[in-house]
Amino acid sequence: QEDDTPAEKRYRVQTGAYRNWAYAENLLRRLQSQNFPAYILLEDGLYKVQVGAYRKLDNAVQMEKTLRDQGYSTFLAM
């Protein structure tokens, strides 16, 4: 039987959104080479490069700060 409960909301840190896969992949590889848990999400025709999926807002905020300290542009997504 399928679980009909809504998916648990997670906080994610977005570092880029591109129409071009190659640009997104380049950023993904750079983040992963620095051991960030990055991935690409295709949404609304954009390849969104995001890091993490946190239950707690505080954890996402800490990751956002870490990424900004490394020079990445970021914002929190849900």
Task: Annotate each language-model stretch with its function.
Residues 2-10, 19-78:
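Extracytoplasmic
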